[in-house]
A protein has these predicted regions:
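Mg2+-dependent phosphoryl-transfer enzymes with acidic/Ser/Thr/Gly-rich catalytic loops
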Residues: 3-8, 25, 194-275
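Asp-based phosphoryl-transfer active-site loop
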Residues: 5-21
Length: 275
């Protein structure tokens, strides 16, 4: 049977591309090298900020020597080309009035809120232990500012409320009540609440990228393991769920790898459908 004509490979990072030690295994790296040599664009698709994904893109030499690559960050809030100039290929940003409104809400709830800049994780509470987890996860420094709404004079793809897990449900419900129909709010961990533009998702941004390239979903393979990967796995011509994926994610997949993220599941998918 002929292999699908895959031109774009979208890969979630944690639990998919990387193993539990946050490393890309040699077999997976070799499979990616072969796919890139065939002209396939590799899109690193993550909920992390762009700066938090950039080290992985550099490690894979995406955007160098004809190795086509892009970073899909903020769960689809932006797609940035890995080539010179880091062109923004697609983005959705929070309405400007939402920045002070969200900061005011966080202050009323006595919880930290952060956003992102090229310098790192920006917040009025750089010593907050829950906010510091976002810096640790992304290997980015905490940048303390006296007044976040004043500091943020640039487009914002995402803000993140960080808090003790005990407070998650009541704060989330209060936020949903206050911002209904204006932005999307959802928990991404027991201590994080994402605040993003309405409708942000990995499938929507990938559709925009494919349209820009003159391609269709039939030219896309997407691999993931988490709930935020469901949309792109369902949308892709070849949707791949890792063996370690959650049940609802596997339900959206065309193919479930026999191997998990610790045993070259991504390499298995690349070898089966691309090489």
């Amino acid at each position: 049977m002929a292999k699908p004509n895959i031109k774009v490979l979208a890969l979630d990072l944690d639990g998919t591309l990387t193993n539990d030690d946050k490393q890309i295994t040699p077999r997976t790296r070799a499979a990616l090298d072969q796919a890139l040599a065939k002209g396939v664009m590799v899109v690193l698709a993550s909920g992390r900020p762009t700066e938090g994904v950039t080290p992985v893109a550099r490690d894979l030499a995406l955007g160098q020597n004809g190795r086509a690559g892009a970073i899909l960050s903020y769960n689809g809030g932006a797609i940035v080309d890995c080539g010179p100039g880091a062109r923004i290929l697609w983005q959705q940003v929070l309405p400007a009035p939402m920045v002070p409104a969200l900061c005011s809400f966080a202050a009323q709830q006595n919880v930290a809120i952060v956003t992102y800049s090229p310098e790192g994780i920006v917040t009025e509470r750089p010593q907050d232990p829950w906010a510091m987890r976002e810096g640790f996860t992304n290997k980015l420094p905490m940048v303390g500012v006296p007044d976040l709404p004043t500091y943020v004079n640039y487009p914002v793809n995402k803000m993140l409320i960080t808090l003790d897990p005990i407070r998650l449900r009541p704060v989330l419900q209060a936020g949903l009540d206050r911002f209904a129909g204006q932005i999307d709010l959802y928990p991404s961990s027991p201590f994080f609440i994402e605040a993003v533009p309405l409708g942000v998702a990995k499938d929507r941004s990938l559709a925009a990228l494919l349209d820009r390239m003159g391609l269709t979903r039939d030219n896309l393979m997407a691999c993931g393991d988490g709930m935020n990967d469901r949309s792109m796995i369902h949308y892709a011509g070849v949707g791949v769920a890792m063996a370690n994926a959650e049940g609802p994610v596997k339900a959206q997949a065309d193919y479930i790898t026999a191997a998990d993220n610790n045993h070259d599941g991504v390499a298995e998918a690349i070898e089966r459908f691309i090489l």
